[in-house]
Amino acid sequence: MDAESILHMLDVESAAEHRTDGWWVDVPDLDVRGLATLMRTREVRFVTLTGTPDTAGGYRLIYHWDADGALLNIATTVSAGCIASIADIWPAADWVERELRDYYALVFEGRAETPTLMLLEGDEPGLFSRTSAAGREIDPAVTARDAAEAERKES
């Protein structure tokens, strides 16, 4: 199914912007499970999910889909640190949900478990949240364990 038809079904085509790299739309309060189910039934392929902190203290999540060769990017905002999981509908979302949990301590509701992906077992989720508070000069890949230990000692 083509991207424009999907946007029409979501009733967001008027807010969507077509760019050289695909269709982009922001959907506040997105029902991600409803979206994932619609995409599954319409045979639109899940590509990935990206997440970044937003300026209001929440997170911006972008669900990327391949609709007959056109990239469809549907963004939403998470303010409370949790959002519904789509991994049971789209197993390919499993790793990226685990990655976002490790990096930002996001909770994906509905998962039976969320094992670590980038962190070691027993490490606290939220690697980027912790290290960004310590300053930009810290390399999270190298010093995450040291930053977490220093934070524990200060508490």
Language-model segments: residues:
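Terminal low-complexity/charged segments
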Residues: 1-155
